[in-house]
């Protein structure tokens, strides 16, 4: 793993392919601007072949003057290349697994190589910087992938795990492709339907030689989704010391923006961007945090745009006192213990709004749940 990984966010393409998700033009513009301001290097902003309205939205985003490099997803069709906006680079997608080439395209490997060579040449003759995307790369023959990258004269090659069949330990397959494309290799992961592992597989791809990776905010995407932008960026920074140029303090606000625009609720304990990730109930954790935060934290919530809190329940009195201080209330041990007992009863009553122990101390809604549950 060398240098800094380039983040290519595809919320406006693969993210919007999530069943039931469609962004308005204003939402697309707001999200693109937020990602650009945060420092995301590349944005995939649509599919020209989807029609006139989609092309108008692409042109609108392209006209914003963003710092990010803009790309669009294109099939290996002359019509797709003609439909793209002049302000964006094409990412040419071609099926590369035998089952796709033969069953979907009724072609052969030799035919696919000829098409790749011809379309890439056409794009370059028009002065375009091309990225070649290999659909279903994870099920393709590695020698064929190298041949495809070679006939395309080694553009960036996007290795797409289209069906989410790779596990993190299979990333070594990328070493050969990385050597063949010299030096740029992109990686696009889809969440396996068996386990949510896209962020880890993407990190493994970086270790295997990927220089560019695809993400979507909140992991939006077809089927079980894509690698979440926030998880990949923060993991690269914390685990591997890689700064992708993204302002991590903006991640929480961007997540909120996309949550509203997509109408897809984000779990309260979603990694990185939700406060519950930094909320503690276990007595040993609360006690440790009040003594010294370092042993129970690899980072601090404000770095990711989140906040920290203790949580009501059967936590020790010391934690209860800390929580009440967050509410601006002074109390003794007995009062703190009584509050904790009341919170436990409120939580067991399963209030419809999820109050009680699930509420951090800084949310006074937990107090309202106490009377019905026989609280303090």
From Swiss-Prot:
Q: Which residues cross the membrane?
A: none
Query: Which reaction does this enzyme catalyse, per its entry?
Result: acetyl-CoA + 2-oxoglutarate + H2O = (2R)-homocitrate + CoA + H(+)
Keywords assigned? Nitrogen fixation, Transferase
Q: For the Pyruvate carboxyltransferase domain, which residue ranges apply?
A: 5-252
Matching PROSITE patterns: PYR_CT
What EC identifiers does the entry list?
A: 2.3.3.14
Q: Name one GO molecular function term.
A: homocitrate synthase activity
InterPro entries hit by this protein: Aldolase_TIM, PYR_CT
**Enzyme kind, highest EC tier:** transferase
Alphabetical GO biological process terms: nitrogen fixation
Gene3D superfamilies reported for this sequence? Aldolase class I
Q: Which family does it belong to?
A: Belongs to the alpha-IPM synthase/homocitrate synthase family.
The family database entries (PANTHER family) matched by this protein are listed as: HOMOCITRATE SYNTHASE, ISOPROPYLMALATE_HOMOCITRATE_CITRAMALATE SYNTHASE FAMILY PROTEIN
Functional description taken from the UniProt entry:
This protein is a Fe-Mo-cofactor biosynthetic component.
Q: What is this protein called?
A: Homocitrate synthase
The organism encoding this protein is: Azospirillum brasilense
Q: Which lineage ranks, top first, belong to the organism behind this chain?
A: Bacteria, Pseudomonadati, Pseudomonadota, Alphaproteobacteria, Rhodospirillales
Q: Which gene encodes it?
A: nifV
């Amino acid at each position: 793993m060398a240098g800094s990984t380039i983040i290519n966010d595809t919320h406006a393409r693969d993210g919007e392919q999530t069943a039931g998700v469609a962004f308005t033009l204003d939402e697309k513009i707001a999200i693109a601007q937020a990602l650009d301001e945060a420092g995301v290097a590349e944005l995939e902003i649509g599919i020209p072949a989807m029609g006139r309205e989609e092309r108008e939205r692409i042109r609108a985003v392209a006209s914003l003057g963003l710092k990010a490099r803009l790309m669009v997803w294109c099939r290996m069709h002359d019509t797709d290349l003609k439909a793209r906006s002049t302000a964006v680079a094409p990412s040419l997608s071609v099926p590369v697994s035998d089952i796709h080439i033969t069953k979907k395209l009724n072609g052969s490997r030799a035919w696919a190589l000829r098409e790749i060579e011809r379309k890439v040449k056409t794009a370059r003759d028009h002065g375009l910087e091309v990225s070649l995307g290999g659909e279903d790369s994870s099920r393709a023959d590695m020698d064929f992938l190298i041949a495809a990258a070679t006939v395309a004269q080694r553009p960036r090659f996007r290795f797409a795990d289209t069906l989410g069949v790779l596990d993190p330990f299979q990333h070594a397959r990328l070493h050969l492709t990385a050597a063949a494309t010299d030096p740029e290799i992109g990686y696009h992961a889809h969440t396996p339907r068996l386990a949510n592992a896209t962020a880890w597989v993407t990190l493994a791809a970086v270790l295997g030689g990927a220089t560019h990776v695809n993400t979507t905010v909140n992991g939006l995407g077809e089927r079980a989704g894509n690698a979440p932008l926030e998880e990949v960026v923060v993991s690269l920074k914390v685990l591997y010391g890689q700064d992708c140029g993204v302002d991590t303090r903006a991640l929480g606000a961007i997540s909120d923006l996309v949550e509203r625009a997509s109408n897809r609720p984000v779990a309260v304990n979603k990694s990185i961007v939700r406060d519950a990730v930094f909320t503690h109930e276990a007595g040993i954790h609360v006690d440790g945090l009040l003594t010294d935060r370092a042993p129970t934290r690899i980072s601090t919530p404000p770095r990711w745009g989140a906040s920290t809190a203790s949580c009501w329940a059967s936590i020790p009195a010391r934690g209860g006192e800390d929580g009440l201080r967050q509410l601006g209330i002074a109390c003794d041990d007995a009062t703190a213990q009584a509050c904790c007992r009341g919170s436990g009863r409120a939580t067991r009553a399963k209030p419809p709004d999820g109050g009680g122990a699930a509420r951090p101390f800084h949310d006074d809604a937990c107090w309202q749940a106490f009377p019905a549950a026989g609280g303090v």
